[in-house]
From Swiss-Prot:
CC terms in the record's Gene Ontology section: cytosol
Annotated positions binding Zn(2+): C37, H226, E230
Residue ranges of coiled coil: none
Native source species: Arabidopsis thaliana (Mouse-ear cress)
Keyword line: Aminoacyl-tRNA synthetase, ATP-binding, Cytoplasm, Ligase, Metal-binding, Nucleotide-binding, Protein biosynthesis, Zinc
Residue numbers binding ATP: K261
CDD domains: CysRS_core
Protein name: Cysteine--tRNA ligase 1, cytoplasmic
EC class name: ligase
One protein family per Pfam: tRNA-synt_1e
Record motif 'KMSKS' region, residues: 258-262
């Protein structure tokens, strides 16, 4: 058996259905299908939507990196009653915000899925599936609406842990007296004024739930009733849900309350990207174990931005120093561990954590191999920008100035004032200027013959040098990556 075969373990995923970490076994060897619930397109997407997109983009990237042929489907729900309140033709509104969402995903460096179906394009298939559900005795039509009978689904509630006798139908909306069971849900809704509708055997109407792979993913809030309903209706039509593994990412919270449009406590991707580079937002969204809640925090965004900025000059330094030194045994060991962590995800976390403590090792040598390893990690994590690093740094510095409420001329003026204070040995004033700028997230660094500035986390005392060391950054992002697959609740 080759060394590669010895090192490569089974891929392990946490399955929401069983609440266990399970060895992943594809339906078809070498091929994987992933279905992820996308947005309801009627407004700009917030960072809660972004977390789901980034989480499953990470999975998609990693599976492709392992060599799997991946079919990745992420849908658009472009048929919804929310659109009618926006003063625009519903499908025009949906089309516009589908395109805006794709621009947001490009900014976050989320790869395009292989398929992006829209509900409105698949009405014929949806109608056929509803007919099959009714034919199998699991659905019934009432006055143009079609409902699913949850009493016909013995396993209803298994995914979310909800017991049918404990579900609180009518908690948010009045119970429809036409239902045989208050928990029955709509497969199709009769047409209403101002909403798009399509002809069907039950009259004009639209789907109540989009009708759907080997892996099915989405936000934790979709477990019930959305994904429960998907399972029930698919089993009713096809005798099997067709899904073996259910993955759910945690909520993004604001002051520990789930971020959402109904509470108006959300920030859109566009709002954050106006002040931070989108890759800093991506880094932030991967900073917690993917199934855990992630609380929105300006300080955490600042830290992610700082880490992203710090990485760039180190990579430039590595590229510039290629071949100048011999590779140390310690550097070789670090490279090996990083590569193994990326390629074979079940590598021992405890061993990596022990290595993380060795951050004082000299800046890595034999830099061709190190840069290759780092680029490999960053590419899978979606943090390898297509911009030149000069362009990236320029963009991040401009956003730092925006957050600080300053122009670059003002910063340069403060640097000149500090230089004059140092020449006159007024070190108290010199330190005060540096401190005031640091308070605004502007860190001054003295280099031979000059003083330069860079973005930094405000209100924290900057460390010497360029902030996070390369080793620390590599291990930080590897731990983020491992967390997607490993950690349970």
């Amino acid at each position: 058996m080759s060394e590669m075969e010895v090192e490569k373990p089974d891929l392990t995923l946490y399955n929401t259905m069983t609440q266990l970490k399970e060895v992943y076994k594809p339906m078809n060897p070498g091929k994987i299908g992933i279905y992820v619930c996308g947005i309801t397109a009627y407004d700009y997407s917030h960072i809660g939507h972004a977390r789901a997109a980034v989480s499953f983009d990470l999975l998609y990237r990693y599976l492709r990196h392992l060599g799997y042929q991946v079919t990745y489907v992420r849908n658009f729900t472009d048929v919804d009653d929310k659109a009618k309140n926006c003063g625009e033709k519903p499908l025009d509104l949906s089309n516009r915000f589908c395109e805006e969402y794709l621009l947001d995903m490009a900014a976050l460096q989320c790869l395009l899925p292989t398929h992006q179906p829209r509900v409105s394009d698949h009405m014929e298939q949806i109608i056929k599936m509803i007919e099959k559900i009714i034919e199998n005795g699991c659905g019934y039509a009432v006055g143009g609406d079609v409902f699913f009978s949850v009493d016909k689904s013995p396993s209803y509630g298994q995914l979310s842990g909800q017991r049918l006798d404990h579900t609180q139908a009518g908690k948010r909306v009045a119970v429809d007296s036409r239902k045989r069971n208050p928990a029955d849900f709509a497969l199709r809704k009769a047409a209403k004024s101002g909403e798009p509708s399509w002809e069907s055997p039950w009259g004009h109407g639209r789907p109540g739930w989009h009708i759907e792979f080997d892996i099915h993913g989405g936000g934790a809030d979709l477990k019930f009733p959305h994904h429960e309903n998907e399972i029930a209706q698919t089993c009713a039509a096809c005798e099997d849900s067709g899904v073996n593994y259910w993955l759910h990412n945690g909520h993004v919270t604001n002051n520990n309350v789930k971020m959402g449009k109904s509470l108006n406590n959300f920030f859109t991707i566009r709002q954050i990207a106006a002040n931070y580079h989108p890759l800093a937002l991506r880094h932030f969204l991967m900073s917690a174990q993917y199934r855990s809640p992630l609380n929105y925090s300006v300080s955490q965004l600042e830290s992610s931005s700082d880490a992203l900025y710090s990485l760039s000059p180190y990579r430039e330094e590595m590229s510039g120093d290629v071949g100048k030194t011999q590779q140390s045994a310690e550097a070789k060991e670090m490279i090996k561990k990083v590569k193994n962590a990326l390629k074979f995800i079940n590598v021992s976390i405890s061993k990596l954590k022990k290595m993380q403590k060795k951050q004082r090792m000299s800046l890595v040598v034999s830099l061709v191999e190190v840069e290759k390893a780092v680029r490999e990690v960053l590419d899978v994590l979606g943090l390898l920008t297509t911009l030149s690093y000069g362009e990236l740094l320029k963009d991040m510095k401009q956003k730092a100035l925006t957050r600080a409420g300053m122009g670059e001329e003002e910063v340069l003026q403060r640097i000149e004032e500090r230089n004059m204070a140092r020449k006159s040995k007024d070190f108290r004033r010199s330190d005060r200027i540096r401190e005031l700028l640091a308070f605004k997230g502007i860190f001054l660094e003295d280099v031979p013959g000059d003083t330069v500035w860079r973005p930094s986390t405000p209100l924290t005392k900057p460390k010497s040098g360029l902030g996070l060391g390369m080793t620390a950054i590599v291990f930080a992002i590897v731990f983020t990556f491992l967390g997607f697959f490993f950690y349970s609740r």
